[in-house]
Amino acid sequence: MSEALSASALATLFIDARTHSAWRETPVSDAQLRDLYEMVRLGPTSANCSPGRLLFVTTPQAKARLKPALSSGNVEKTMQAPVTAIVAWDSEFYEALPTLFPYADARAWFTSSPAVAEETAFRNSSLQAGYLIMACRALGLDTGPMSGFDRAAVDAEFFSGTPWKSNLLINIGYGDSEKLHPRLPRLAFEDACAIV
């Protein structure tokens, strides 16, 4: 990978991409969701641990189950979005490490320290959420990530009896650009970065 992306590709992924709150009625297919995951799973994670898990909420019945856990400002946009991805992390992600990282006994790194396992899973599932956003943009989809929801309620409703724990939500679909607000400011390099 020695060549920079084209200006149009950078515009799609970063410069012109926006967070959407209003959605067109164009559906997102199951095949598209599979295509998204095929890209997300290739993104790097610590020791290839891949703790992120995705539950794609697509049906009216499933959306109704999610609705009570949403903060009030996130209800309408989530009910309207074709897909809401519950980005979760698997608290037992290390069970797959003999396959995912066969070069060492990486499983033991995490079974010996639950705190390290949880921190690793949460951090890396957050990283994978970023990959999902970029994969959506690359495939022509828009996103609206959210952290305004009751994690305990989501876990009880969707993940009871499993090792999955929710991290954040990402609405996915085709955004209504006419309802976008002006882009908010971003921090300048001097305010957010340092070189030593």
Curated annotation (Swiss-Prot):
Q: Which reaction does it catalyse?
A: 3-hydroxypropanoate + NADP(+) = 3-oxopropanoate + NADPH + H(+)
Q: What class of enzyme is it?
A: oxidoreductase
Keyword RNA-binding applies: no
- Give the source's domain of life in one word: Bacteria
What's its EC? 1.1.1.298
Question: Which NCBIfam families does the record match to this protein?
Answer: PRK05365.1
Q: Could you identify this protein by its name? A: Probable malonic semialdehyde reductase RutE
Q: Which organism is it from?
A: Cronobacter sakazakii (strain ATCC BAA-894)
Give the lineage: Bacteria, Pseudomonadati, Pseudomonadota, Gammaproteobacteria, Enterobacterales
